Swiss-Prot record:
Keywords: Mitochondrion, Ribonucleoprotein, Ribosomal protein
Record function comment: Component of the mitochondrial ribosome (mitoribosome), a dedicated translation machinery responsible for the synthesis of mitochondrial genome-encoded proteins, including at least some of the essential transmembrane subunits of the mitochondrial respiratory chain. The mitoribosomes are attached to the mitochondrial inner membrane and translation products are cotranslationally integrated into the membrane.
UniProt-annotated location(s): Mitochondrion
TM segment ranges: none
Oligomer and partners: Component of the mitochondrial large ribosomal subunit (mt-LSU). Mature yeast 74S mitochondrial ribosomes consist of a small (37S) and a large (54S) subunit. The 37S small subunit contains a 15S ribosomal RNA (15S mt-rRNA) and at least 32 different proteins. The 54S large subunit contains a 21S rRNA (21S mt-rRNA) and at least 45 different proteins.
Name of the protein in question: Large ribosomal subunit protein mL53
Length: 100
C-alpha cells in the first residue's frame, strides 16, 4: 500500500471475533507496521467493537489533498480493499511526478 499520500486512516468498529471484520483486521495489520507510522506520519485511528455488538466495521481514509473515502470492508476482501484505497494514492503520486 502507498501510505505516503494518506493523512488519516480510521478503522472503526472492528469486532475481532467476527468474520465480517476480517478485511478490516487485515488492513489494520498492514497499516500498523512500524514503517507505515514512522516514515509517512500516518494518523491511524482504531476502535474495537465488543463481541456482542452487531455494528458493522468501517474504513475512512483522508488523503493529503483532503479527499475523503469511506468504505464498507464487509463487502470486499483485503485485496479489493487495498486496491480501492491505493487507486487515489496512485493518482496523487502521478500528479506529484508530473509537477516535477
Amino acid at each position: 500500500m502507498i501510505f505516503g499520500y494518506i493523512n488519516k486512516l480510521s478503522i472503526l468498529n472492528v469486532n475481532p471475533f467476527s468474520k465480517a471484520s476480517q478485511s478490516a483486521k487485515l488492513l489494520l495489520a498492514v497499516a500498523s507496521k512500524e514503517t507505515s507510522n514512522s516514515l509517512y506520519g500516518l494518523n491511524l485511528i482504531t476502535s474495537l467493537a465488543s463481541k456482542d455488538t452487531n455494528s458493522k466495521p468501517s474504513v475512512e481514509v483522508v488523503y493529503k489533498d483532503g479527499k475523503k473515502l469511506t468504505v464498507d470492508p464487509t463487502k470486499m476482501n483485503i485485496g479489493r480493499l487495498t486496491e480501492l484505497i491505493d487507486d487515489y494514492s496512485k493518482t496523487l503520486k502521478f500528479k506529484e511526478m508530473m509537477q516535477k
